Amino acid sequence: MAGAAGLIGKSPIVDTHTHFYDPSRKQGVPWPSKTDPLLYRTVLPADWRKVATPHGVTGTVVVEASAWVDDNQWILDLAKNDKSLLGLVGHLEPTSADFAANLERFAKNKLFLGIRLSARPIAECLANPVQFANLKRLADAGLMLDAIGQPEMLTDVARLAERIPALRIVIDHVPYSPPRMPKELAQYPQVYAKVSGGMPSTDALDELWSVFGEDRLVYGSNWPVSDKVAPYADIFGNVKKYFAAKGRVAEEKYFWKNSQAAYRWKTR
């Protein structure tokens, strides 16, 4: 991916939510299930580029699709010589006695940007001092957290933002259906929302805009899972139309500048 500073006429577009995996590996994969006829196949960066490049998408932040610790390294190895992969949001369990050691191990790689947790682990971290300390380690390392869950999780996201102001948090797969985003999240500048929830309506996007504004919304496709909803072209085109109507400045923020602030990915 060319340096952003050199792309004045043609801005980069960064997809902050893709998954890569290979069931043909000797060890297989923990996800997706063999019973999923759409997703259970080898999905690698070259496959993503085939659907994304025609729309001007220049890079991606890969999000974990495996609870196996060594699969963090598997993605980092994929990214080593592939400049379209800007980084990984990995998987580490705050309940693990090895969390600190694994975090230190992976944080040495500049492409390791943070981890993803679902609603239950986030709630447990807020209640358990040891697990909470592990999330603070994440912030102290300059890394971030992707949060995935239902609307009920958002109260805990706000609590976490209050207790660890240095931790950048990206809420995955919004808008929810029906749209539901607490206005209180507007007060936390370190909390971002990733529009990766399928084909949101204008009203749903308006609600997100009212809470996060032009500085804290980021683009993510959720490919290849998004194929269950619509082709990549449709997913992209839906948000492209909405944010283009907001003007060039807002559009650039949505498609790459905000994600750079949230993930601290660097051009390669």
Residue spans for each PLM region:
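Active-site metal-binding loops of divalent metal-dependent hydrolases
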Residues: 18, 65, 119, 174, ...
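Mid-to-C-terminal alpha-helical segments outside catalytic/metal-binding sites
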Residues: 1-16, 41-59, 207, 213-218, ...
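Active-site micro-motifs of SAM-dependent methyltransferase domains
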Residues: 20-22, 176, 200, 225, ...
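Mid-domain alpha/beta scaffold segments of enzyme catalytic cores
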Residues: 3-137, 141, 179-180
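Catalytic pocket-lining loop regions of alpha/beta-barrel enzymes
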Residues: 113, 127-218, 229, 267
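Active-site phosphate/pyrophosphate- and oxyanion-stabilizing loops and adjacent acidic/basic residues
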Residues: 49, 76-77, 104, 158-159, ...
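N-terminal cationic-hydrophobic initiation segments that often serve targeting/anchoring roles
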Residues: 52, 79, 107, 161-162, ...
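Short alpha-helical
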Residues: 69-70, 97, 152-155, 234
